[in-house]
């Protein structure tokens, strides 16, 4: 089981926008190498994200399914990586001031061999992986916020 937190310099709506775009998952979820398809109803409960994980030629095809969602607040997934197992991943978004978000990610294997061999080494690896996952998520959400930041570029304004 691993829980990590990161303060992202973007409002919850901006972070959620990244979560709600299933096609971005290979950009920020460590280990996901390719998104094969995203159900049109993503991120509604029951919607699936079809992905590849791991290095080629050993990559595995699987799916992740939305269990619960509260727009701009949380997303819970059942993430598959069979034959290794299946995890529950819960991402929560808490406002931190006017333009920041505390993102928490909790992941726990619930089935398969990775569930059976719970130990400190697995927890440490999962913890480090999820720190990097949230760093990548922050990069995307913060970049989107900077691109949308209002600027006054009217003629005669100082640059």
Model-derived features with residue positions:
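Beta-strand/loop substructures that line and gate deep hydrophobic ligand-binding cavities in soluble
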Residues: 78-132, 148-150
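Short beta-strand segments that buttress and anchor functional surface loops
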Residues: 47-54, 75-82
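Hydrophobic pocket/interface hotspot
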Residues: 15-19, 25, 49, 66, ...
